[in-house]
């Protein structure tokens, strides 16, 4: 992964982590009894975003890949359940509506991150550059 791509992913996950953390802290501390499932999902998503940001920053590629895969599954499951069983989601989470309240960034970001992370792992090592042979 190139430096600019890495910095952009770290920044995106850090900002989303801060936003989700702020939202979930308010939800959990003020009205957890009203909608425990959505608010706990918000808290889990916040922790996941922070973990992914740290993993990208520290170069923990496998942790970042697993984290973004879990994120994508979470967005798809919560987004689908929000439409199929709206009674489970009396209030919004970061992932409700496939992240529509956040401009669908929660849906697009893990796809982009997985493409970048998985493509970066398939590059040939520098010492494998083919040299002309005699």
State the predicted function of each range.
Residues 93-112:
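Individual transmembrane alpha-helices with interfacial aromatic-anchor signatures
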